[in-house]
């Protein structure tokens, strides 16, 4: 992959926020190596993503659940979208860009079982969307940096997003723009991501679709078992009564949209992340 952007790095008195102000008088320092647009797994596999190296106790701040929520909130707040879920032509919208082993496994399973026969899907750079479902500049689409844009047409014409997240491990939950786009679009979604991903999403104040279809895949700790369960769910969803499901789920989907664009709720989740700095400092691992 190309060199990552420089990480945020500071070794200073704690930020001048109300939540941290009590530490400043004690001359406490919090040393933070931050790369919040990456997951812990990615920076572990690619240590060059986390630099400069520092030989002191410190926190590795990675994206978790809030970085891309904050990023997408600021990118799309105040915009007017034209989403229309009244006429679905395809079953799934399934977007794969950067090649990753877990993505290849699910992609091949879905393809080989014929589940994607009536779907819009990509597997860059070999398989792309039809031109009419791409933004005008998408034929020269860069490998990195423009994934957060939203084009309504593919969401309007597909019933459900298969969210192809960055990682599928069982020790963190990393949420990217891939989940926030169908939430903004008020579309159904199935997530191929980390163990307990949906549970984390609900802990952050969102709702999922367990009243409409099976979401037991979220409880599958083994990533290969999780893939098997997701394949079964998607296979059954090809026969779903989407028009009825969209009518019955209107309030739920609107709730998620409103929650996403609720600055107070976003701030609460960000403050929960900041509390990790306090817990680290209170553990007396950081020298004063």
Question: Which residues does each predicted region cover?
Answer:
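Single conserved hydrophobic/aromatic residue that forms the stacking wall/gate
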Residues: 1-25, 30-32
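Pol beta-like nucleotidyltransferase catalytic core
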Residues: 26-27, 31-163, 169-176, 180-288
């Amino acid at each position: 992959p190309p060199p990552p952007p420089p990480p945020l790095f500071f070794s200073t008195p704690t930020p001048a926020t109300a939540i941290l102000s009590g530490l400043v008088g004690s001359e406490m320092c919090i040393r933070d190596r931050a790369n919040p647009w990456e997951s812990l797994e990615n920076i572990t596999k690619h240590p060059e993503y986390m630099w400069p190296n520092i030989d002191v106790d410190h926190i590795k701040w990675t994206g978790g659940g809030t970085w891309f929520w904050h990023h997408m909130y600021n990118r799309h707040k105040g915009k007017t979208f034209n989403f229309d879920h009244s006429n679905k032509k395809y079953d799934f919208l399934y977007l794969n860009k950067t090649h990753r082993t877990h993505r290849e496994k699910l992609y091949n399973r879905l393809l080989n079982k014929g589940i994607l026969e009536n779907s819009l899907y990509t597997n860059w750079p070999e398989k792309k969307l039809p031109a009419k479902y791409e933004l005008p500049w998408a034929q020269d689409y860069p490998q990195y940096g423009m994934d957060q844009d939203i084009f309504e047409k593919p969401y309007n014409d597909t019933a459900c997003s298969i969210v192809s997240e960055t990682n599928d491990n069982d020790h963190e939950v990393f949420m990217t723009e891939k989940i926030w786009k169908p939430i903004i679009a008020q579309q159904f979604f199935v997530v191929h991501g980390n163990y307990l991903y949906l549970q984390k999403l609900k802990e952050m104040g969102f709702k999922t679709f367990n009243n409409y279809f099976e979401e037991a895949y979220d409880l599958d700790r083994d990533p290969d078992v999780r893939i098997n369960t997701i394949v079964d769910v998607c296979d059954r969803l090809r026969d779903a009564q989407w028009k009825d499901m969209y009518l019955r789920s209107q309030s739920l989907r609107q709730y998620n949209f409103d929650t996403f664009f609720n600055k107070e709720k976003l701030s609460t989740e960000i403050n929960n992340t900041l509390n990790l700095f306090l817990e680290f400092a209170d553990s007396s691992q950081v020298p004063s």
